Curated annotation (Swiss-Prot):
Bias type Basic and acidic residues, positions: 221-230
Domain named MADS-box: residues: 3-57
Record domain K-box: where: 87-177
Keyword Magnesium: no
Origin species: Arabidopsis thaliana
Subcellular location: Nucleus
InterPro entries: MADS-box/MEF2_TF, MEF2-like_N, TF_Kbox, TF_MADSbox, TF_MADSbox_sf
GO molecular function: DNA-binding transcription factor activity; protein dimerization activity; RNA polymerase II transcription regulatory region sequence-specific DNA binding
Gene of this entry: AGL11
A Gene Ontology term for the protein's cellular component: nucleus
Function: Probable transcription factor. Is required, together with TT16/AGL32 for the maternal control of endothelium formation, which is essential for female gametophyte development and fertilization, and seed formation.
Name this polypeptide is given: Agamous-like MADS-box protein AGL11
Length: 230
């Protein structure tokens, strides 16, 4: 967890106050040195402790820096407040941004073929070169995307071919299974018919033999009528 926010107020304990002063003073001197080195700024720092001890830092001669400060304060050209300086800076930056926006808008209109009447031959040539470069980049990107789409389509075609092969294999397996099952059923039916025919044949033979022995071994035709004489 982060450290809690320290309340900025006078430290009552003198020992703690002195320890904090030493730490903060060293940090302040370090920051002043870093500012002078990183930003090539002329920095002068003067600190008096509660006991009246002087601490100072200057990347240049501190007296010359103080004199420069006095001169800057007395110079009428440097009497502007910080707010006025900031306002002037932001006004300049705002004007620069507006100019950049206007330039970009004009350039876009030129690329669209508008507002060309005010351009010279050289400027028109520059617009033409920009368009050619833009078209070249667009075509290159389009070609790249088309290659990706073709590659994806080829991969999809291979996947579909593999799926078709798999489905045809499964269909062939089902057809072979059905054909084998049909052959087994047909063979069983033929065997059953042959067995039934065989049983009927033997039963008919036995009945025929029994009828022949009861009539003295003579063949009796049931369709013939017997004439009895009185």
């Amino acid at each position: 967890m982060g450290r809690g926010k320290i309340e900025i107020k006078r430290i009552e304990n003198s020992t703690n106050r002195q320890v904090t002063f030493c730490k903060r003073r060293n940090g302040l001197l370090k920051k002043a040195y870093e500012l002078s080195v990183l930003c090539d700024a002329e920095v002068a720092l003067i600190v008096f402790s509660t006991r009246g001890r002087l601490y100072e830092y200057a990347n240049n001669n501190i007296r010359s820096t103080i004199e420069r400060y006095k001169k800057a304060c007395s110079d009428s050209t440097n009497t502007s407040t910080v707010q006025e300086i900031n306002a002037a800076y932001y006004q300049q930056e705002s004007a620069k941004l507006r100019q950049q926006i206007q330039t970009i808008q004009n350039s876009n209109r030129n690329l669209m073929g508008d507002s060309l009447s005010s351009l010279s031959v050289k400027e028109l040539k520059q617009v033409e070169n920009r368009l050619e470069k833009a078209i070249s980049r667009i075509r290159s990107k389009k070609h790249e995307l088309l290659l990706v789409e073709i590659e994806n389509a080829q991969k999809r075609e291979i996947e579909l071919d593999n799926e078709n092969i798999y489905l045809r294999t499964k269909v062939a397996e089902v057809e072979r299974y059905q054909q084998h099952h049909h052959q087994m059923v047909s063979g069983s039916e033929i065997n059953a018919i042959e067995a039934l025919a065989s049983r009927n044949y033997f039963a008919h033979s036995i009945m025929t033999a029994g009828s022949g022995s009861g009539n003295g071994g003579s063949y009796s035709d049931p369709d013939k009528k017997i004439l009895h004489l009185g």
